[in-house]
Structures are given as C-alpha cells and as structure tokens.
Design a protein with these regions (language model features):
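Short loop/turn motifs that connect adjacent beta-strands in outer-membrane beta-barrel proteins
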Residues: 25-43, 74, 117-123, 151-155, ...
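Short glycine/proline- and aromatic-enriched beta-strand/turn motifs that initiate or cap beta-hairpins
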Residues: 25-71, 75, 385-387
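Outer membrane beta-barrel transmembrane domains
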Residues: 96-98, 222-224, 228-260, 277-289, ...
C-alpha cells in the first residue's frame, strides 16, 4: 500500500515536533539534565530480544532490536525495529482453504525526549512515532508525552496523547489466490477495504509511600472510528455468508492500579495489580494480577505471576447461527463474546557482572532475561504459549 498524504503529513509533523523538543526546548524550560556532561560522552543501551507466540492456528516468531542513546546535553533518542513472521491457518487471517501460510510484518518506531530541571521539580517532554506494514495493512501513529517529577522524584505524574491511522486491506491465500487478471493485477489482493483513525490519551500518578512501598494509578482513553471489523471473517446469516460488520465508532476506557512492597529481610517483592475496562460496545472486563519477585543471590532474580481475566459480551454478539437479516451488526470475532482467561508464567533475570575480567567483560554491566507464560483462553483460540528472551547491554 502506498503512504497516503495524510500519513506523510503526520510523520512530518512528528519530525518537526521531535526536533522542537530536542533542540529548542531549553530556551523556554530551563537547563536540561545531562547524562554525562563531565566526560562529554554519549551513553546508551542496546537490547536484542526474541519474542514467540503459539496457539492452535497461529505461530508468531518476532526478533527485535532496540537502541537508546542519551547525549551529553540530555537529549534521549530511542529506536526500535521488529520483524513478525506470522504463520497461520486461520480464516480470520485470510486463508480460504486448509493450508498454512507465513507473512512478514515490519515495524519500526522512534522517540525523542529531553528532561529539564525546574529547581525542585523535573519535567521531561517527549515525542514518538511508529509505522507498521504487512501485505494487508499499513499502520502509523504518533504521540507526545510529558512526565513531571516532584518531591525528589517520589511523586511522578505522566500524561500522553496519541493519534493512530490504519489502512486496512485484504489478501487471500490458497486455491488460485496467485491468479492474475488480464491487466496483470493479482486477484488475491482485494486492495484497500477501509481505514481506521483514532486518538488515545492516558494519565498516571506514581507515589512512593515508604522506601519499600509505592503505589500507582492510571486512566486510559481510546477513541477509534472507521473500519473496525476483520475483512476476512464472514458470518452465516439465514443461509447467506455475510461479511462481518461492526459499529464504526468505539470508545474504550481503562482504569488500573498497582501496589508494590519490598520485604528487605527475604529480598522479596510483591506487586498487586488490577485493571478494569469498559467500552460503548457494552464489553466490561476485570483483570487482577499478582507478581512475586525473589532475589536469588547477587546476580539472579526470579519473577512469578498469575493473571486472571474475564469479560462480558458486546451488545451485538450472538452465537454464530443466531444472527438474522434484521441485525445491523454481525460478528465472528471470539473477543466479542464473554470469556475468561488464566495466565501463569515466570521470568528469570541474570545480571552479567560475573563476566568481569573475562573476554566478555564488555557485557558485565548488562543482563539476560528469559520469560515463559502459559495462557488458558476460554474461547475458541484455546491454549497459548508466550516466550521471550533478551540480552540488554548498557554502554
């Protein structure tokens, strides 16, 4: 898909905004906080990460690289690149016969920010942008954010605003999907099906209560309009196969909170988390989670977690054989129904300080992490496995 004039304008606006934050902010906000003014050197962090997801009909392998840099005068720049290799046999992904296919999604993002010293407070301003592309869609987004630190950073207030724009297409796989018409156009590529636009806003507050106790709370709002269905899904309506049809506007709200406590005698931390969600499609959800962190010596930390999720159904959801011609909206999306999920997992973090004095001493300030989660889904997606591993190296 070609990049629309609107998308080009959005990305240009992001570049201009980022340049303003990074280069001219000091003129009106005061002195920036520098990473290493004394030595005049840049500092940064490099992350190499592998992501894996598996369920009955879909497998995703996604290598990722992230780079963050901080200049001597306090400008922070980050970039992220991810490649998704998605193997699926799901009709919802465009399969029209019993085959598996693999397609690739490329995603890149950049962000820039700067923190300014306001005396007894610090203010960080930032901007970010993202572009994601695969054969049947192009997604772009941009955002701005601000973080205010008070009371010697024991109180942190954060706010963000973002814009998203997606061009949605359809590419069919299987049978004679590779056929072309007399003009040479691939018949499997149905072209642009629709577009989606949206804005999102979030605000959060984090407060240190005691040296070993802190709490946080957040509110998120997402407004989207446009094509909100899946171009590959169809519903049998009184014997007629009908394309999925969802409302064209959706407003989502989420409230979340976290309480964290560190037990110094046993080097153990407990995090209690809760998230509630509701939208104007009448879906409501609650999502409690508990995490336990345990230090195992000087170099190893183990995290275990359990997460519960349950939601109600949307106002237009029906069993697949219960839709009628009078229904304005029809869906085959399992996420529109009511269901319950359980997730159980662990994460292991190994600090690499033991590499000091060896040929790999350049890694001694970094760490390696490995995580594994098992998800029991109460809908037709069934059970799923999520795994990650990464190497994080500061420099």
């Amino acid at each position: 898909m070609s990049v629309s004039p609107r998308t080009r304008a959005i990305l240009l606006a992001l570049v201009c905004l980022a340049a303003g934050v990074g280069l001219f902010g000091a003129d009106w906000l005061g002195a920036p906080l520098a990473a290493d003014e004394a030595s005049g050197t840049w500092t940064g962090n490099l992350t190499l990460q592998g992501n894996y997801y598996w369920e009955t009909s879909t497998r995703v392998v996604a290598p990722e690289v992230r780079l963050s840099l901080t200049s001597p005068d306090g400008v922070q720049i980050s970039a992220d690149y991810l490649v998704d290799a998605i193997t699926s046999a799901s009709i919802a992904a465009g399969v029209i016969e019993d085959i598996r296919f693999t397609e690739v999604r490329n995603q890149g993002s950049v962000s820039i920010g700067r923190e300014f010293d306001l005396g007894e407070a610090q203010l960080r301003l930032g901007a970010s942008g993202l572009i994601s592309h695969e054969p049947d869609y192009l997604a772009t987004s941009l955002g701005v954010n601000a973080t205010l630190s008070l009371n010697q950073r024991s109180t942190i207030v954060y706010g963000a605003l973002g814009y998203i724009h997606d061009d949605v297409g359809a590419v069919l796989r299987g049978m004679n999907a590779a056929a072309v018409d007399p003009m040479g156009r691939m018949l499997s590529n149905r072209g642009r099906v629709g577009e989606l636009e949206g804005v999102n806003a979030s605000v959060s507050v984090q407060q240190v209560i005691l040296p070993n106790l802190w709490i946080s709370g957040a509110y998120d709002l997402i407004y989207t309009q446009g094509y909100l269905a899946n171009p590959y899904r169809s519903v049998m309506v009184q014997g007629i196969l009908t394309p999925e049809q969802h409302p064209s506007v959706r407003v989502r709200h989420a409230l979340s909170g976290r309480l964290a406590y560190y037990f110094e005698p046993t080097h153990t931390a407990v995090h209690l988390m809760y998230r509630s969600y509701f939208d104007d499609w009448e879906i409501g959800a609650m999502n409690p989670e508990v995490r336990l962190y345990q230090e195992l010596g000087e170099n190893v930390t183990l995290r275990a977690r359990y997460r519960f999720y349950t939601q109600t159904r949307s106002f237009f959801w029906r069993p697949v054989d219960m839709f009628t011609a009078d229904d304005p909206f029809v869906t085959a999306d399992p996420k529109m129904g009511g269901f319950t999920n359980h997730l159980l997992g662990f994460r292991l973090v190994v600090q690499l300080g033991f590499l000091a004095g060896t040929p790999l001493s350049f890694l001694e300030r970094g760490y390696f992490d490995l995580s594994f989660d098992y998800l029991w889904q109460g809908n037709r997606y069934g059970e799923a496995v999520l795994a990650q591993s990464g190497l994080h190296v500061p420099f």
